Amino acid sequence: MERWADRRDDGLAHLAVTQWWTTKGVFATKLRDSEEELLRICVRKWGRLLVHVFDRGYASGPGLQVLTKCRARFVIRWIKDHVFFTTWGEEKKLWQIGQGKKYLAHKEIRDPSSGERMPCDLWWTAVRHPSSGEQLYVVKARVKQGVMYLSTNDPVKTEAQAWEVFFTYRRRWQIELSFRYAQCELALECPRLWSLEARLKLLAMVMLVYAFLLSLLDPRHHELVEALLRFKCHRTGMRGKQTLAPLYPLRWALSRLWDDYRPRLTCFLPPSNDPLSVCSLIRDLERIHKNWG
């Protein structure tokens, strides 16, 4: 389970906090409790500087109550059949609230993945949810003949505020890309290990690799990464150069580099042809394991 924070100074998403959870064994917990714990960590660290973005899978009354209790700013995409109260106190489904209303804002936007330009229309109003007494605002967005409903607790009274909510939600695709990378490239969709000790070791190794890859994205290593990509993962097309998916080619380049040039770990481990040093290392490791578990 991960939470990503967006830094607007460089426009990139950064990993804020990550945590493993399970429903079995001695570390068993509930998914909602783990999500609430991560939310509280982010709220304590950044307060109202962060806007928490949630997709339709998190749109529910209990989740809204947790966000209200933590006093967090949020943008949630809702299913159109969810029930809200209008400003006149009428109980209606989301699609009925904005039915027949003229859109209040129009703009041509650009798809960041394909570069396609498309028209976008917005309409907004104030609403309330049955599970929360907090004043909410819903933004109805029509893009490519599809309609989405976004709710937020930030005030939406002007066109600029409505566009801010819309573009905040659209940045979720960078976070979805990171989730897909963790599930596919790092093989975290379903680790199949029976013993808890082996599973914890595997997860620790994966997190070590993940942290190493993320550390290479630091601007201080830009020249090193560029040289590595030119050497082992060269791309000539403009689309391949401009695509915002840095971890994929970086891992491919490292894999090909280490296949051709195996890294030497003699600075950490003694050479295998020195049996005395190897036995001394094994003895020290056993002593550390005995004292520290």
What do these predicted ranges mean?
Residues 4-293:
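Single, function-defining residue in the core of a domain
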